[in-house]
Amino acid sequence: MSKGHSLQDPYLNTLRKEKVGVSIYLVNGIKLQGTIESFDQFVILLKNTVSQMVYKHAISTVVPVRPIRLPSATDADGADAEPGNA
């Protein structure tokens, strides 16, 4: 996994697995809402009443409807999470 995806992939995967609703803001200001059905290196499949394939290069911001907790190596040991991952 490349260094650029070390946060992006676990973040998107947690949103997908927990079916957390998201607002995705595009670089042109358009707001899309739904749940992340799938994603790869280049696109996110966003599900609402229909599925939309959204190219990552067009995305400005991904905002979940609730806080999420990212899995980390320290969580597996039972230790406290790193600052900022609460």
From Swiss-Prot:
Keyword terms of this UniProt record: RNA-binding, Stress response
- Mind telling me which Pfam families this protein's record contains? Hfq (PF17209)
So which domain of life are we looking at?
Answer: Bacteria
Record-linked CDD domains? Hfq (cd01716)
Domain Sm, chain residue ranges per copy: 9-68
Gene3D superfamilies per UniProt: 2.30.30.100
What is one Gene Ontology biological process annotated in the Swiss-Prot or TrEMBL record? Answer: regulation of RNA stability
Question: Which function does this protein serve?
Answer: RNA chaperone that binds small regulatory RNA (sRNAs) and mRNAs to facilitate mRNA translational regulation in response to envelope stress, environmental stress and changes in metabolite concentrations. Also binds with high specificity to tRNAs.
| Subunit note | Homohexamer.
Query: What is the protein named?
Result: RNA-binding protein Hfq
The organism of origin for this protein: Pseudomonas syringae pv. tomato (strain ATCC BAA-871 / DC3000)
Per the record, the gene is hfq
